[in-house]
Amino acid sequence: MDAVQVVGDGQMECTRVGVLVGGGSLGFGDEAMPMKVMRAKDLDVMVCGEITEWTLCAYVNDASQLGKRRAMIVIGHERTEEWGMKHMATWLAPLVPGVPVSFLNAKEPFWYV
């Protein structure tokens, strides 16, 4: 992502961080799942790929207004999966000798104004 989105207090002290890559932060059919994980694991910050803005942003903003340490960093779907896909190419190549394996950067699909 050519920009990083942040919700919550960017200056707060952070002790616990969770990561949901790609579409995992959409909740796998349960859009409340990221909030449930933040509460259950007592996470200060959730680093996300892609989000449902009307739920996760509202939760983080509401929690911050109530004095809880909560923030979210949204990096983008492709960018959060990129690290794993680079590793996948390295991991897969020895398993398929003779077959060319390489990482192709999907790049940021959006352009910004």
Where are these regions (language model features)?
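Active-site catalytic microenvironments in core metabolic enzymes, especially phosphate/sugar-handling
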Residues: 1-113
